[in-house]
């Protein structure tokens, strides 16, 4: 459906839709840095969509909005020291995944590396976490989810099979090897000059 520039715009849009359809559509939320997006992220998002599309649980009129909250570049830089892909690119790619309704950024504030404030404002009915999270009570957002009546669903998309940090490290190692190979091919590896 849409990429929103912030949570406020999303909430305004949701309220407007509620006025038109006569009820407040529930939100099924998932979140992450998705930097870079990998198959584990994809499976978590696809499984979240599959849950939302379950006709036994949600008749088509009551299907929740599949909403993906994406951590901003500053959040990633503060947490892991870098961002690999821009927020805009990550949001657009996620928006292209079939069944995703809304994509919104989460902006880093006050050394808080959680999305608890976002959950407090959005008040989703469900919050899904990927395969590396198996104990709902052991996530930082557990308490706020309990306060707002949000069910936490863990292990979504299967077991953890990739790490964004690992992918970036592999890309860095590949680039270094390419530079070393180029230097060797130019004769720098034979003691002519250093590079």
Where are the regions that the model predicts?
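Nucleotidyltransferase catalytic core that binds NTPs
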Residues: 1-195
């Amino acid at each position: 459906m849409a990429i929103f520039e912030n949570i406020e715009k999303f909430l305004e849009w949701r309220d407007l839709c509620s006025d038109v359809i006569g009820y407040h559509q529930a939100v099924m939320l998932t979140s992450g840095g998705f930097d870079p997006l990998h198959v584990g992220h994809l499976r978590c998002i696809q499984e979240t969509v599959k849950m939302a599309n379950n006709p036994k649980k949600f008749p088509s009129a009551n299907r929740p909005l599949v909403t993906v909250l994406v951590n901003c570049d500053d959040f990633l830089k503060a947490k892991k020291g870098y961002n690999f892909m821009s927020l805009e690119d990550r949001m657009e790619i996620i928006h292209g995944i079939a069944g995703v309704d809304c994509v919104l950024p989460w902006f880093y504030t006050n050394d808080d590396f959680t999305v608890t404030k976002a959950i407090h404002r959005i008040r989703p009915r469900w919050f899904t976490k990927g395969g590396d999270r198996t104990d709902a009570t052991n996530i930082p957002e557990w308490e706020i989810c309990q306060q707002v009546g949000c069910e936490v669903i863990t292990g979504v998309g299967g077991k953890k099979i990739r790490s964004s940090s690992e992918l970036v490290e592999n890309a860095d190692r590949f680039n270094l090897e390419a530079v070393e190979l180029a230097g060797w091919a130019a004769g720098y590896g034979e003691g002519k000059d250093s590079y």
